[in-house]
Amino acid sequence: LQQYNLASNIKGIRYAGNVGDPVFAAADGQVVYAADGLKEYGNLVLVKHINGYITAYAHNSKLNVKSGQNVTAGQKIAEMGSSGTTRTMLEFQVRLDGKPVNPASVLPNS
């Protein structure tokens, strides 16, 4: 849908999909936030990883995890939706020390 582009205020990768499509954790970690308190991100999951990275999964229709829960890579953590936006999508972000990092630069090629 849209690639990382800080000039356009796109701080991650936006993937198109259908309401209810599964959202999977990118790597092992601990859920540090799973709620809808940040309006622009809708239902949001934040996962902290041992290497200092935090991954964010925004605009979900349903959250399958809770704060404090440990997750493994590939585990279903949410379902895609359109909360906080006008179309169904997953906005996937990676942050290091609070700053956005291009997800393509840290994820393995598939």
Question: Residues of each region from the PLM?
Answer:
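Surface-exposed, glycine-biased beta-strand/turn segments
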Residues: L1-Y41
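Residue-level recognition of beta-strand microenvironments
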Residues: Q3, A34-A35, L63, M80-S83
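Short, basic/aromatic beta-hairpin or loop at an interaction surface
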Residues: Q3-L6, N43-T55
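Short, acidic/hydrophobic/Gly-rich beta-strand patch recurrent on exposed beta strands
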Residues: G12-A16, L44-H49, E91-Q93
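Short, well-structured beta-strand-loop connectors
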Residues: P22-V31, V65-E79
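Short histidine-centered loop motifs in beta-beta connectors
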Residues: A34, I50-G74
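Conserved, short, structured surface segments that act as functional micro-motifs
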Residues: Q69-S110
